[in-house]
Swiss-Prot record:
Compartmental location: Nucleus; Mitochondrion inner membrane
GO biological process, one term: mitochondrial respiratory chain complex I assembly
Disulfide cross-links: none
UniProt GO cellular component terms: mitochondrial inner membrane; mitochondrion; nucleus
CDD domains in UniProt: Mth938_2P1-like
Signal peptide: none
This protein's name: NADH dehydrogenase [ubiquinone] 1 alpha subcomplex assembly factor 3
Recorded name of the encoding gene: Ndufaf3
Subunit record text: Interacts with NDUFAF4, NDUFS2 and NDUFS3.
Top-level lineage group: Eukaryota
Keywords: Membrane, Mitochondrion, Mitochondrion inner membrane, Nucleus
Family: Belongs to the NDUFAF3 family.
Amino acid sequence: MATALGFRCLFRTRPAPLCRHVDRLWRNPRRGHRLSPADDELYQRTRISLLQSEFPQAVYIDSYSSRGFTICGNRVFGPCVLLPQTVVQWNVGSHQDITEESFSLFWMLEPRIEIVVVGTGNKTERLHPQVLQAMRQRGIAVEVQDTPNACATFNFLCHEGRVTGAALIPPPGETALASLGQASE
């Protein structure tokens, strides 16, 4: 036991300074990218915590209306595209306006989007076959749903940690006359 304690003290003692250069290196060791196993673990870790407290890891849809969406507490008016940590206005009016060009944003991104959830309004509409074919050729799955279900699916996939995108068209609002007409029938 005494010898083990003696060896431990031996390694902690400072060598006699042979010159000022050796003494300076002993007080201020250089920390390079190649650390020896004897170095403290504190110097081997890299942490970035500033951005984690300011920005969420993923974009979540809080609510939707006929005017647009509430995404992470921010209101977005009109159709929009949701990407990991980004929201972009989308220049489409209805599902008929969705073209290969309007989806080109999804295959230009790195890391590659795994699945795109498309919300087409109040009901599920069919997209042009060429658009779906273009997405399949680039290895991106497409899920077409009505907007309320597309919002829920997008949130679920983001919660799972998948690299997900969404292209959402707000459902059209009901006018007071239309809702009164349905109520009287």
